[in-house]
Curated annotation (Swiss-Prot):
Gene3D superfamilies: 1.10.8.60, ClpX chaperone, C4-type zinc finger domain, P-loop containing nucleotide triphosphate hydrolases
Source organism of the structure: Crocosphaera subtropica (strain ATCC 51142 / BH68)
UniProt KW keywords: ATP-binding, Chaperone, Metal-binding, Nucleotide-binding, Zinc
Binding of Zn(2+), residues: 10, 13, 32, 35
Function: ATP-dependent specificity component of the Clp protease. It directs the protease to specific substrates. Can perform chaperone functions in the absence of ClpP.
Molecular functions per Gene Ontology: ATP binding; ATP hydrolysis activity; ATP-dependent protein folding chaperone; protein dimerization activity; unfolded protein binding; zinc ion binding
Residues annotated for ATP binding in this entry: 132-139
Gene for this chain: clpX
The protein's name in its UniProt record: ATP-dependent Clp protease ATP-binding subunit ClpX
Complex and partners: Component of the ClpX-ClpP complex. Forms a hexameric ring that, in the presence of ATP, binds to fourteen ClpP subunits assembled into a disk-like structure with a central cavity, resembling the structure of eukaryotic proteasomes.
Domain ClpX-type ZB: 1-51
GO terms for biological process, alphabetical: cell division; proteolysis involved in protein catabolic process
Length: 435
């Protein structure tokens, strides 16, 4: 036997048994310890690549980037100050968010430190944002993630369906967060997930449905464990899970979920409840405009109102922190155009400045844009659409022209939208004298 053993070689690199530390035998093949180590390195590199195949848990070295210690964690007032730089108005919602997020990551630092002597367990408090479209719900959640330097993912509740039906599984929400975290499971488990259009998965009535509601109550049921905290199996390539697929395990106990929705009609539920308590007296909000009355009513929302709206009680119980955002006024829209750090006017001024052209919006033009956006009833989202329409011809022509120093956007351009004005206005500016 020893006669043949001396001639054993690695089937991959060709090294003999004497040249390596260990030679592993298989049915008709041999592999040395050096080739095994090389294979492990190749697999690890594939796991780290965002487009590479994944197994159960990607191996990631290093310390987490998230601010989890109390010393690094910004205080509620600091969080609100940061939000003020990017989001105009909504002061009450900002305070609620700042306190809730600060307490959430305080809880996370306590869990990681594991030095609590009195064994008091702090429960997670997910957040519900209610407000009309374009009022800043997504932007608030996104800005929170920026100040805390944590992974942030956005999901649309309307695309989710109950397991076993056509559509996305709720676990695909976690996959988006994992991808944003560069496949770092530990980092993803400290992130923030914003679930938009959460009001669209309300069941059709307060009473439990006899028929299946696969994109309503069924999705709420599927989200319960994820919101509360569970170890979820996430399919690495997305889509439906199947028995022979390797899944990544993610613990959602420390992921902060922020749910947002317009909740159109919820104010009527609140008004009905309040009206019953104030029978014989002046109705709340009487004499106010419809929008103002609806906004005031939303500030008085209670969990029972959400249940009557169509959210199941178990779901409402897992989002204890609620904040209502006010609809945007014309004055607020004017401020949104000009004041935030990344205001639309500043963005377009920077774009034209790269072509050596100065861009200026007259105050009357800004007001006219805000008035048109207010009429569209889509909040701040309407602003970008209007400015894009205004600037299209200007930004098409100016890069090819070298004689324009300044571009002025006037009230007439906003109101008339004539192509001739947009093209002729830059040419009326002072141009450098030809040599």
């Amino acid at each position: 036997m020893s006669k043949y053993d001396s001639h054993l070689k690695c089937s991959f690199c060709g090294k003999s048994q004497e040249q390596v530390r260990k030679l592993i035998a298989g049915p008709g093949v041999y592999i040395c310890d050096e080739c095994v180590e090389l294979c492990n390195e190749i697999l690890d590199e594939e796991l780290i690549r965002p487009d590479g195949p994944m197994t159960k848990e990607p191996v990631r070295p290093g310390n987490p980037k998230t601010r989890t210690s109390l010393k690094e964690l910004p205080k509620p007032m600091e969080i609100k100050d940061y939000l003020d730089e990017y989001v105009i108005g909504q002061d009450e919602a900002k305070k609620v968010l700042s306190v809730a997020v600060y307490n959430h990551y305080k809880r996370l630092s306590l869990v990681q430190g594991k030095n609590d002597e009195d064994n008091i367990e702090l429960q997670k408090s997910n957040i519900l944002l209610m407000g009309p479209t374009g009022s800043g719900k997504t932007l608030l959640a996104q800005t929170l993630a920026q100040v805390l330097e944590v992974p942030f993912a956005v999901a649309d509740a309307t695309t989710l369906t109950e397991a076993g039906y056509v559509g996305e599984d709720v676990e695909n929400i976690l996959l988006r967060l994992l991808q944003v975290a560069d496949l770092d499971v530990e980092e993803a488990q400290r992130g923030i997930i914003y679930i938009d259009e959460i009001d669209k998965i309300a069941r059709k009535s307060e009473n439990p449905s006899i028929t299946r509601d696969v994109s309503g109550e069924g999705v709420q049921q599927a989200l319960l464990k994820m919101l509360e905290g569970t170890v979820a199996n996430v399919p690495p390539q997305g889509g439906r899970k199947h028995p022979y697929q390797d899944c990544i395990q993610i613990d959602t106990s420390n992921i902060l979920f922020i749910c947002g929705g317009a909740f159109v009609g919820l104010e009527r539920v609140i008004e009905q409840r309040i009206g019953k308590k104030s029978m014989g007296f002046v109705r709340p909000g009487e004499g106010q405009s419809k929008e103002k009355r609806a906004a005031d009513l939303m500030q008085r929302v209670e969990p029972d109102d959400l249940v009557k709206f169509g959210m199941i009680p178990e779901f409402v119980g897992r989002i204890p922190v609620m904040a209502a955002l006010n609809p945007l006024t014309e004055e607020t829209l004017v401020a949104i155009l000009t004041k935030p750090r990344n205001a639309l006017v500043k963005q377009y001024q920077k774009l034209l400045n790269m072509d050596n052209v100065e861009l200026e919006f007259s105050q009357e033009a800004v007001k006219a844009i805000a008035q048109e956006a207010y009429r569209r009833k889509t909040g701040a989202r309407a602003l970008r659409g209007i400015v894009e329409e205004l600037m299209l011809d200007v930004m098409y022509e100016l890069p090819s022209r070298k004689d324009v120093q300044k571009c002025m956007i006037t009230k007439e351009m906003v109101e008339q939208r004539s192509t001739s004005e947009l093209l002729l206005h830059p040419s009326s500016m002072v141009t450098p004298e030809s040599a």
